């Protein structure tokens, strides 16, 4: 099985563009890449219009499980996802759902090896949501990331992206993915020499 990587962040940070660029860069390096976008099913897309964060969380979790069930993790060197279960924790808790309940709901969901969180100030012109709500979601990402690292075997990597363009962010992800694929055990270079 290859790497399962997720790209996260508030609306408007450029997740979709970064995922597309990173996939393109990885393919240039000869890697087999499968991209995933959440939500991807009718129920997941429909849930975007609902007002109840608990119902949304249930729908997004179903969407996620159905989407990931279709992914052949064995055939890809890298599975790159535009959003992961972390989105449900951040967004639905910002809308009022209990974070612990959301965490338990995600327990059976396949987990990425690494989640890259693109972090920058919300820009009102970029997003579907107002700036105040996105700032609340941004704070919930921090809380959710701490819980996830405690509860699951998922590494969280923050990308401070205030002064970075999408290509630079994608290049960081690609470099990290290639390093992990070349050295899956994470053995420091100095231990491998001599």
UniProtKB/Swiss-Prot annotation:
Binding site for ATP: 9-16
Cited Pfam families: Thymidylate_kin
EC number annotated for this UniProt entry: 2.7.4.9
Keyword Transferase (UniProt): yes
Source organism superkingdom: Archaea
Catalytically driven reaction(s): dTMP + ATP = dTDP + ADP
Keyword check for Nucleotide-binding: yes
GO biological process assignments: dTDP biosynthetic process; dTTP biosynthetic process; dUDP biosynthetic process
Any one GO MF annotation of this record: ATP binding
Transmembrane segments: none
Family: Belongs to the thymidylate kinase family.
HAMAP family: Thymidylate_kinase (MF_00165)
Protein name as it appears in the record: Probable thymidylate kinase
Organism name: Methanopyrus kandleri (strain AV19 / DSM 6324 / JCM 9639 / NBRC 100938)
Gene name of the record: tmk
